Amino acid sequence: MKIFVYHTPEETPTENMPDCAIAVDVLRATTTMATAIYAGAEAVQVFSDIEELMTVSEKWSADKRIRVGERGGKKVEGCDEGNSPLNFTSETVKGKRLFMTTTNGTRCLKRIQNAKVVLAAALVNRRSVVEYLKENQPETIWILGSGWEGSYSLEDTVCAGAIAHSLLAETNSLSDENVGNDEVFGAMSLYLQWQDKLHELMNHASHGQRLQRLECYEDLKYCSQIDILDVLPMQKEIGVLS
């Protein structure tokens, strides 16, 4: 195995796709995806733009779909829900498909949609991702942060570090030959420094501060929890995870 960490979709190579690509958007898209699928959603279908989401979702009956739209941390007008994972309970989502577009996370998934295996990871389902990687041992792994509109994010980097460190430590693979770029060491170092203070780190992060201004305090607490959901959102067809 060789692991690469990229802080934003824009940083990834354009010529080759890895054996396994992992999208991370801790605040909040991949946390929401993991939560919704764990709660019984039929699938999550991602879109880069709102117009396409509305057009495609119109083909589904209203009682079988949930339109999820977020821009700048706020719910998009015309959508049923914004991007708060706390809204996606089993009562809300069971048997329904989420049609989802967000500022950063869905763009991240679009960038890697042609990889052999595409996963969605957050802190809440870190363990499920690590166990999949240990079992399947993909030759090349990209862990791709969503960032914020093309910029670095603390929360996605600490999650990438949590995945990379657990995987390499538990497979006795913590050597240079398994590390594809410097960003892997940087991400692992961030995680090891903050692993017992993840909620505090979220509050320091620029997007965490943005969500505080929107009074999304409970979202920040929830997204900071690690290994609480045994769920592995995986792309089954282009743009559709379940």
Swiss-Prot record:
It catalyses: (2R)-O-phospho-3-sulfolactate + H2O = (2R)-3-sulfolactate + phosphate. Its EC number is 3.1.3.71. Its cofactor is Mg(2+). This is Probable 2-phosphosulfolactate phosphatase. The gene is comB. Belongs to the ComB family. It is an enzyme of class 3 (hydrolase). The keyword Chaperone does not apply. It holds the Pfam family 2-ph_phosp. Transmembrane segments: none annotated. Keywords: Hydrolase, Magnesium. One of its GO terms (molecular function) is 2-phosphosulfolactate phosphatase activity. InterPro entries: ComB-like, ComB-like_sf.
